[in-house]
Amino acid sequence: MEFVNLRFFVLICFSWLSFIPIANAKYLLIENENIWHELLQISVASKISEKCTSIEARKIKGLFALLQIKSVAKELGYTDNEINEFVSSEENKKKLKNETDIYLLDNGVDLNNVKIICLFGHSEMDQETTIGSLLRIK
């Protein structure tokens, strides 16, 4: 089954992360900076691949990155139920989308200029960043 776009796939997989606090006073997963940063990287790569026709997402690599995030959450003591509830949070989805746009804007990307988005994506690949590693030239 081929996914139409990685962003939709990311949002589906995003449900693996929990928003519900645990009785033993663990932080919400959304407050875990490392997990949130990794999700943001995947989301930025996804948005670049959606907007730039010369770049595509490395979907399998993105899936493995999401599975790694889930593994980290489990190591932190979050249950499958807690992790699975995170995707269903529309608030978290909106926050990720907004922070993706903010990240791109903060890096000089005009979200209405496809050429600039593509240049940023190519730059990320050239610099071998995490975002760049989730992308490839078509």
Give a label for each model feature.
Residues 1-10:
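Bacterial N-terminal signal peptides that target proteins for export
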Residues 9-19:
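Bacterial N-terminal signal peptides
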Residues 20-25:
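Sec/Tat signal peptide C-region and signal peptidase I cleavage site
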